[in-house]
């Protein structure tokens, strides 16, 4: 058998959890996603971290960074709503960027993000997406991440009234 089974529902619902700002594996499990169980409860460095708040805590990883990024003044920035509102208004300032990659808070989360940045562009009535990934296990994660990227483009286009056009995935370190 030369094809690997893909799990589109898990990929999409994991992204839904990020968009909701989840910080607990139990929140993901409540929507049918088990992808965070091991990172939250079995990764030795995180299990022993003084920043871990208990069983199932994933910390300030993906969802927390997306919905509650800490600004220089301590105020929280909701990257998702900021980008959504600018896309919906048709304002492409070449800064329609959502990122989960916050080096100042790596120790506050279970792991550093692999698929870490999404940058949108508006051209006419079309929405484009370019996504950056620092690391990719091609055998296990590639199809999962591609589903998430396409879902991100199609969903953002749908809720902003634009047409989804093209998604590009840039991978810096692909490995087997």
Task: Identify what each model region corresponds to.
Residues 1-176:
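Terminal, non-catalytic protein-protein interaction segments that mediate quaternary/complex assembly
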